[in-house]
A protein has these predicted regions:
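Short, flexible, solvent-exposed loop/turn segments with mixed acidic/basic and small polar residues
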Residues: 2-8, 63-64, 130-142, 161
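N-terminal alpha-helical "arm" segments
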Residues: 2-28
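Short cationic amphipathic helices and targeting signals
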Residues: 14-16, 73, 142-150
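Generic structural motif
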Residues: 21-23, 76-82, 141, 153
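Surface-exposed, low-hydrophobicity interaction/linker segments
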Residues: 26-135
């Protein structure tokens, strides 16, 4: 697959030229459902979730048939990461509280690491994931072209990997 980027005044579009033939809408829906976006469990250590979603609705993985040769769908990336600007002061406060509770002058590295892990886990339960949805259009007109509406190399790489797992 070849990845080209075209810049516009308000955004970028990447074109992927695919060798595989586009499946029918029913087969495409089935393939996308197998790799649909899944919510991140805040109790887990997972920080990123990547999957397909709808063109208009990020909660479902249904492709939209625009005309005979164009099908649109979404590529969704969720990231659940506690910002260090939030984690550091909360960890300091929790360490101070633990020192007072245990009547200690200081905590050792292991105690600080344990407090940091507990604070991070508590914050993950309260902080919503950052969601990024990128529209995708698959055209059969010119050499089976897939358009990805992004200028980000990282998003393009994640898309390419998921696309190959789903449709190859």
């Amino acid at each position: 697959e070849v990845n080209e980027m075209v810049n516009f005044k308000t955004g970028s579009v990447r074109r992927f030229f695919v060798q595989t033939e586009r499946p029918g809408l029913g087969d495409m829906t089935e393939s996308m459902a197998a790799h649909a976006h899944r919510e991140i469990d805040p109790a887990s250590e997972v920080e990123t979730s990547v999957g397909w979603c709808g063109f208009w609705d990020e909660r479902v993985a249904d492709p939209t048939q625009f005309d005979v040769n164009l099908v649109g769908f979404g590529f969704r990336v969720d990231t659940l990461k506690v910002p260090n600007a939030v984690l550091a002061p909360k960890t300091r406060d929790a360490c101070e509280a633990l020192k007072q509770e245990l009547k200690l002058d200081s905590l050792n590295r292991q105690q600080i690491a344990d407090v940091r892990a507990q604070v991070k886990q508590q914050l993950r339960l309260r902080i919503p994931p950052r969601t990024q949805v990128t529209q995708v259009v698959w055209s059969e007109d010119e050499k089976d072209v897939v358009y990805l509406m992004t200028g980000s190399d990282a998003v393009a790489a994640q898309f390419h990997e998921l696309f190959e797992r789903t449709f190859d």
